[in-house]
Amino acid sequence: MVEAERAENSWIASETSPSSSPVVIESSDFSITDGMRDVSGFGIASRPQLDKGLSENNIGFTERVFSAAGAAVLSAVTLNPLDVVKTRLQAQAAGMSYSHPLSNSIGRMAFFGPNMMFADLRCSPSCARAGVEGTVSICPPDCFQYKGTFDVFTKIIRQEGLGRLWRGTNAGLALAVPMVGIYLPFYDMFRNRLEELSREKAPAMTFCVPTVAGSLARSLACTVCYPIDLARTRMQAFKEAKAGVKPPGVFKTLVGVFSEVRTANNLESSLHNYRGLWRGLGAQLARDVPFSAICWSTLEPIKKRLLGVAGNDTNLVGVFGATFSAGFIAGSIAAAATCPLDVARTRRQIEKDPGRALMMTTRQTLIEVWRDGGMRGLFMGMGPRVARAGPSVGIVVSFYEVVKYVLHRHASS
């Protein structure tokens, strides 16, 4: 939604002078709440116009949540296959086997116990390497080893069907809607308040406001929605127990996660066991907070440059293009930089030993990943992660702003 790693943009207000001098775009003009469009001709409203009508042009909290929810749904449904591919690559690197149950790797699979969700995997009848085990045509073990992004796509489609690429979409939607619905509106609120404080107390620190506000809002959203994210990762990483049998959904997956640590017989132990639903939250925050910081610090300069090139001719389409492009580039850079933390988060979420899972820290997990796979292990799944994060940030940011604008125009009329 998820990795979605999320960002938000703003309508840009440009101040023009009576002369024909170039347009100057100030950093203070990049505001979600302050930036409203001139309804006539879809032009960009000047700063004085915004200051004059700020109270009546403010977007309400409900409208912001609705806009964010729409952006989250579009992003989650469109980009879920890349999230599945990334999770499969990272899970395999962590030691999870995707081999056929009848293959010679059954000993390693037994480690996960009889309740492990494995599909009755079969290659296509046209596979020249398939052998026969009884009446079942199966491939050798390496047919079920993922070798790269494209290889994961082809093998999932061939062995499990095209629909498996949208495995966990319901959990992704259940996660993305509240996640983005909390993140973007609260980002608006935090930033507006911090901007007021910085202008009064420390004007030189105003440039840090978007980074701080984004980190606070992201931390809040991640903490509230984390159990759903844990269920989504489990659903994407594991395969079904039997072919043709519907796999467990979000609720059953969450129950399964909790059941792994439900061995307590007193209140203190019961409260301790609830920590299992937030397993890996530290790694999630360690990934998402830097992601937000990198994304915002990259997005704003790119957006400013693109809108500066457009100058006075910037309209709705131009703002949408600049917003999406800036979000795409910033999201891609942030996703690549934080990939090791995403690998650590995935490894902690799919850990099957409850005791070990609760004791693992992000630092220990990163050291373990480095020991097992070196630099390649730390950046496992970076391709699909970047391919997902770039469009995801661009879609969420641009869609959020466009829907807010449409809702504002409808309310004004």
Curated annotation (Swiss-Prot):
Pfam families reported for this sequence: Mito_carr
Cited PROSITE patterns: SOLCAR
Expression (tissue specificity): Ubiquitous.
Stored SUPFAM superfamilies: Mitochondrial carrier (SSF103506)
Annotated GO MF terms: metallochaperone activity; superoxide dismutase activity
Sequence ranges of the Solcar repeats: 59-193, 205-305, 318-406
Protein induction: By paraquat (methyl viologen).
UniProt keyword list: Membrane, Mitochondrion, Mitochondrion inner membrane, Repeat, Transmembrane, Transmembrane helix, Transport
GO cellular component: membrane; mitochondrial inner membrane; mitochondrion
InterPro entries membership: Mitochondrial_sb/sol_carrier, Mt_carrier_dom_sf, Mtm1-like
GO biological process assignments: manganese ion transport; mitochondrial transmembrane transport; response to paraquat; stress response to metal ion
Membrane topology: Multi-pass membrane protein
Regions that span the bilayer: 65-85, 170-190, 204-226, 284-304, 316-336, 378-399
Subcellular location field: Mitochondrion inner membrane
PANTHER family: FI19922P1-RELATED (PTHR45760:SF2)
Purpose of the protein: Involved in the mitochondrial activation of MSD1 by specifically facilitating insertion of the essential manganese cofactor. Has the ability to activate iron regulon in an iron-dependent manner.
Family of the protein in this entry: Belongs to the mitochondrial carrier (TC 2.A.29) family.
Name of the featured protein: Mitochondrial carrier protein MTM1
Organism in which the protein naturally occurs: Arabidopsis thaliana (Mouse-ear cress)
Classification lineage: Eukaryota, Viridiplantae, Streptophyta, Embryophyta, Tracheophyta
